[in-house]
Amino acid sequence: DQIQAAYDAVLLDYIKRHDIELKPNWHFSGCSFSKYTDQVDVLDNKMTMQYHTDFIISERDMPGSKFQLTCTMYINDNYDGGDIEFFVNGDIINHKPQAGDILVFPSDDPYFHGVKTIYNGEKFFVRNFVMYTFPGTKEWLDNQLKFGAYRWAKEELKRIEHDDPR
């Protein structure tokens, strides 16, 4: 698959440049094709997608797949708006993707990012994530055993709703 081959090449370069050690429990999430259009609801601050990280902080202690690196390939650039904007350590970094660009960045804090509104046309992109399998913290697993899986899941959902601003 050409898209996966492009991701592999860019990720290997990124990993070498940033001296990242590949872990045996890392894997790809799988590609998802998406688009933003000028028909998407525009929020008050002119962002189509609000600032966020792809790592879900509220689920950090739970077992399961977690986001490590965000990888986005841009298919076209014949649209107006749609810049990706990073808010990193208090600085705003704006990038207008060009067709063929692949952006790779850590999925967690401090790499908050959002997408500006499309004013004309459609923006097509392919998203993929490098994920890792996390067994869960000892505390989380102990509580699941102590309270039972069903009750603990309900308690965690309450905590997530309280802790996660999304």
Task: State where each predicted segment sits.
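Fe(II)/2-oxoglutarate oxygenase catalytic core
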Residues: 1-102, 110-166
